[in-house]
Amino acid sequence: RQRLGSEAVRRVFTKTAQLWHNATPHPHWCGLTLLAIDGVFWRTPDTPENDAAFPRQTHAGNPALYPQVKMVCQMELTSHLLTAAAFGTMKNSENELAEQLIEQTGDNTLTLMDKGYYSLGLLNAWSLAGEHRHWMIPLRKGAQYEELRKLGKGDHLVKLKTSPQARKKWPGLGNEVTARLLTVTRKGKVCHLLTSMTDARRFPGGEMADLYSHRWEIELGYREIKQTMQLSRLTLRSKKPELVEQELWGVLLAYNLVRYQMIKMAEHLKGYWPNQLSFSESCGMVMRMLMTLQGASPGRIPELMRDLASMGQLVKLPTRRERAFPRVVKERP
């Protein structure tokens, strides 16, 4: 592991993520691939090397018990394939890490973000980086805007002014940003969604409001990694920073490997998406297949992989019910 380093594993993850994503016929919405970005924290062993490389977060003046790594990933939501990732220390904001994903985002995409990524500079740069690179995000509380035109019920074209600080940081940012504001009521709660999809004819407002709920898929993906793959272990294994980075790229690579096999399984099931299959059961199947391949002749490998792809019927999930309670953060005791 020490001779290999982290860069080689990063390159393998990046290359395979691109290849597998491009090889998958993802379902589209109005011609757009559905993506999401979100952050996740990883705890590292408490060693002097990790402590120096990954400064601890403090709460009320008290340092965290372990050094931590902050990561932001981008995921295709119907397959759960990770398409890009960036990580740093707790001193890096998630927006800083998200900036590294701009150039890795493909054309004809819609990226769903939570309110923590609200930055007109970041959102504007996201749109301008390619062709039809759209985004959707909850409007920041207290944000000031001017309504330009009504597009439908609870649907307006709006103009938002940018700050001098944002224009200084983002040279391509003008004095104003034009966007579309949707006001919807879900389960009695009013929600304001801001998006770059300003063409009301191409992008129906009623469908867009329901679309944002799919952002939760990336959180489910993180749960699959931490609970199933990591067996709910709270701390990574590596005691040196270089190996911590290598381990993280390896975890993402292994997750995508399982997810790509689930894509192959779903192709054999009519009307099923890969995210409607059991990750834990599929992960077990892939692990057993890897052990089988060790003793198989090269000529049998294609047949064994076809057999694995045909087993999707065994890992179908029941219809997912709605969340029974809102997401909450427990208070400290």
Regions flagged by a language model, labelled:
Residues 3, 7, 11-16, 24, ...:
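Single, function-defining residue in the core of a domain
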